[in-house]
Regions:
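A conserved mid-protein helix/loop that constitutes part of the nucleotide-sugar donor-binding site
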Residues: 22-30, 190-203
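A nucleotide-sugar donor-handling region in carbohydrate enzymes
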Residues: 1, 124-191
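Conserved nucleotide-cofactor-binding alpha/beta core module
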Residues: 1-127, 134-142, 210-349
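A structural alpha-helix within SAM-dependent methyltransferase catalytic domains
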Residues: 198, 202-206, 317, 321, ...
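Conserved donor-binding/catalytic core segment of Leloir-type glycosyltransferases
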Residues: 10-15, 178-194, 198, 356
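Non-catalytic membrane-proximal stalk/linker segments that position and tether the catalytic domains
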Residues: 1-14, 18, 160-174, 366-379
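C-terminal alpha-helical cap of glycosyltransferases
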Residues: 348-377
């Protein structure tokens, strides 16, 4: 690709089909708003047309240009990017639904970065960098990634420090929860629930009398299957409560009625983990080896709750039981989480923006100085 003269501002292209009320944009919107517009020019390439909502309006208003490319071909989008002289193209999708990865195969920008949407390597030499952290990709795991790694100093995941939690006060009765009894919660999508995770959950429910498991209702088929599997394991199906979908701010508010978020593995919570932590609900996770199995651990480390990260299934089960069986311990953890939220890095969007902008400046300068692409650590 022919090298252009540097723009006065570093021109960043963000590419996604999810600039709307979607998990990705809930995390990213405040980053777009916080970007230093005196140093960076932001251009959005939206792969999806659709009605406006509050998040889409916030996102589109934060860009210098917001371009709907839904009807354009991959080749046309790639050429448009080159015509606009994008310096750094940030792919927010990877291989997730409605992606347009061929845009990057055709080299839409001299520097191409994989971030957030896809929890792993692209496996392609067309992507130069992947944004991660030391929890997600330990040094010994770098060999499994085709990209060079941009290591953020804390968690790789940005969050919206202005995210709204509804003032609505739900009662347990209206949400189908018992007035008494411990509420285990997991609002991950049901495809993440593996048989061996479900085995552990059912054993925990047998050990904690009167406890219930609160899950998201994905589909009637999923509800029926999980109820059948609970019965097979000797747990009454009506002890599994399914939460209907609701607006995001109210969904965050209803987290207050849960006692403990118990994570899935090997595919752990991502946005759902930060949802829980933002709502002051502790999360117990089991860290694995892959990127997708280490995200909750990254978030818990950044919020100062690494003691909730376990390494084995037995540790996961025993720590969860210990917390569920000890009200004072649970209260101590919740107090620590509430205390840490305003002072730790996880929900500090301003600090995250400063760090990612430092990364963009470094990779831009290296490109124009003909320095080879290599791993970068932001401090």
């Amino acid at each position: 690709m022919q090298k252009n003269k540097p723009n006065k501002k570093i021109r960043i292209g963000y590419y996604s089909a999810d600039f709307r009320a979607h998990a990705m944009s809930y995390l990213l919107v405040n980053l777009f708003e916080q970007h230093d517009k005196s140093k960076f020019e932001l251009i959005a390439f939206s792969f999806r047309s659709g009605k406006n909502d509050e998040i889409k309006n916030r996102v589109s208003n934060s860009f210098d240009k917001f371009i709907d490319v839904n009807l354009k071909s991959d080749k046309e989008i790639s050429q448009l990017s080159r015509d606009l002289k994008i310096d750094i193209a940030v792919d927010l999708m990877g291989f997730t639904q409605n992606n347009r990865f061929n845009i990057f195969v055709q080299r839409c920008a001299p520097i191409q970065v994989n971030y957030l949407g896809y929890p792993g390597t692209s496996g392609s030499n067309c992507i130069d960098y992947l944004i991660a952290d030391k929890i997600l990709i330990p040094k010994q795991n770098q060999k499994y990634f085709s990209e060079k790694i941009i290591y953020m100093p804390d968690s790789y995941q940005v969050n919206d420090s202005k995210r709204k939690i509804s003032d609505k006060v739900f009662t347990k009765k209206e949400l189908g929860l018992p007035e008494d009894g411990f509420v285990f919660c997991c609002f991950n999508q049901s495809y993440k629930i593996t048989p061996y995770v479900f085995d552990i959950w059912m054993r925990l429910m047998k050990r904690i009398d009167g406890s219930v498991l609160w899950l998201i209702k994905d589909s009637d088929i999923g509800v029926n299957n999980l109820k059948k599997e609970a019965q097979k394991r000797g747990v009454e199906p009506d002890r599994i409560i399914f939460a209907d979908k609701m607006s995001n701010d109210e969904h965050l508010a209803r987290h207050r009625l849960a006692d403990l978020f118990i994570d899935t593995f090997p595919y752990t919570a991502h946005t759902t983990c930060s949802d829980a932590l933002w709502s002051s609900l502790p999360v117990v996770t089991r860290i694995g080896q892959s990127f997708a199995s280490r995200v909750s651990a990254s978030l818990l480390t950044a919020i100062g709750l690494s003691e909730l990260i376990t390494k084995t299934e037995k540790e996961y089960e025993e720590l969860t039981f210990k917390i569920a069986n000890n009200k004072s311990l649970l209260n101590e953890i919740k107090k620590k989480l509430t205390k840490n939220k305003p002072i730790k890095s996880l929900f500090n969007t301003k600090l995250f923006t400063k760090n990612i902008e430092s990364a963009f400046v470094i990779i831009h300068e290296r490109y124009h100085s003909n320095i080879l692409v290599k791993n970068i650590e932001i401090k």
